[in-house]
């Protein structure tokens, strides 16, 4: 945004959608080519078509079945602020991933409820540096459970499973903040000097081959019509 029309970049990619909105509000995007928009489900792109999602990550509750029976799983992300969850779950609060989850709580529950949830979280959870560290701690039985993105466990399972073999995933439902899906996005900058190539790249990364490559590396996907 600070570079504005002077940016030397052709394509803007970001991990979380709020950054896409900032650039879009500054009117720095060129419209995405119609052929690219057709590859992305309408739920994963704004109606005006200035940018598209290139990946989606689902918030999940990872737990160690040896320490936490399924009957005791939380019904909602908000439950984790309750006293019965003190010392029983972990998260990585410093990263953009968890900040996006908090933003979902704010959007769905409001400022007062979010503040109370954060106070309860502070009392109850254990902080880790990164989602991988949370997964490893749950797997090792150091803590009962944690809040991460799905692809950390999927990625480990696709390799050796060494850091996830003692874990399972629980998905929150019914418009719960814990059912939050974070979008990585991409758009062509209006200042690009190579717009044709930039549009071609965006079409590839949202297409079958680009999505297959992302799925193989990161277990991330976006919605494709049909």
Region annotations inferred by a language model:
Residues 1-2, 6-143:
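Extracytoplasmic ligand-binding site segments that recognize negatively charged/polar headgroups
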Residues 18-22, 145-166:
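A ligand-binding cleft/hinge motif common to bilobed small-molecule-binding domains
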Residues 39-43, 57, 117-121, 126-128, ...:
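Periplasmic-binding protein-like
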Residues 96-97, 134, 145, 151-155, ...:
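Short, catalytically relevant binding-site loops at active-site mouths
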Residues 184-226:
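Mature extracytoplasmic/periplasmic domains
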């Amino acid at each position: 945004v600070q570079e504005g029309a002077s940016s030397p970049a052709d394509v803007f990619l970001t991990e979380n959608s709020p950054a896409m909105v900032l650039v879009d509000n500054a009117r720095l995007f060129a419209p995405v080519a119609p052929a690219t928009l057709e590859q992305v489900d309408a739920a994963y792109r704004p109606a005006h078509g200035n940018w598209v999602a290139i990946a989606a990550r689902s918030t999940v509750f990872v737990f160690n079945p040896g320490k936490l029976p399924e009957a005791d799983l939380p019904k909602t992300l908000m439950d984790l602020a309750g006293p019965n969850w003190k010392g029983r779950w972990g998260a990585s609060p410093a990263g953009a991933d968890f900040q996006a989850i908090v933003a979902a709580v704010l959007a769905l529950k409001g400022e007062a409820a979010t503040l109370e949830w954060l106070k309860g979280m502070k009392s109850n959870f254990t902080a880790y540096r990164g989602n991988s560290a949370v997964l490893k701690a749950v797997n090792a039985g150091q803590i009962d459970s944690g809040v991460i993105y799905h692809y950390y466990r999927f990625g480990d399972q696709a390799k050796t499973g060494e850091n996830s073999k003692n874990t399972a995933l629980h998905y929150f439902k019914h418009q719960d903040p814990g059912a939050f899906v974070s979008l990585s996005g991409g758009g062509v900058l209006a200042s690009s000097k190579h717009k044709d190539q930039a549009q071609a790249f965006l079409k590839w990364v949202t297409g079958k081959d680009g999505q297959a490559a992302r799925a193989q590396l990161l277990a991330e996907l976006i919605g494709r019509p049909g």
